[in-house]
Amino acid sequence: MCPQPHADHAITRGDTGAAGGRNWSGPFRKTPGRLVGMTLIRAYQLTLSSFIGNSCRHLPTCSEYGFEAIARYGLWAGGWLTLFRVVRCGPGGTHGFDPVPDSLAPRQRWYTPWRYWQPRRKDA
């Protein structure tokens, strides 16, 4: 059986649904690092993603997750979150609903990127 859906996801994250597009459209600071990272992910979505097919095990997809993570937390933290998400998506990894965390834990500092790894999510 499917777990209880997270109905508050669209409300708290600024998603606009199908009319707004597939990527996160909430507010974020437009720094050069964020814009570069988001541009690279968007270029991947428009070019290479169609060749790879629908093979992501998670919702949102890994590229949507990366776009949101970089928009919310910047290129460094969002990039690490995205890398670890792609690793979790591989064989033997997790599946299902796996959103970007609402906030980073205090122990997740820029100089300790290994702490961004979240092998298992606790259901709320």
From Swiss-Prot:
This is Putative membrane protein insertion efficiency factor. It is a peripheral membrane protein. Belongs to the UPF0161 family. The keyword Membrane applies. Residues 1-12 have a biased composition (Basic and acidic residues). It comes from Rhizobium meliloti (strain 1021) (Ensifer meliloti). Keywords: Cell inner membrane, Cell membrane, Membrane. Could be involved in insertion of integral membrane proteins into the membrane. InterPro entries: Membr_insert_effic_factor_YidD (IPR002696). The keyword Membrane applies. It is found in: Cell inner membrane. Pfam families: YidD (PF01809). GO terms for cellular component: plasma membrane. Residues 1-26 are annotated as: Disordered.
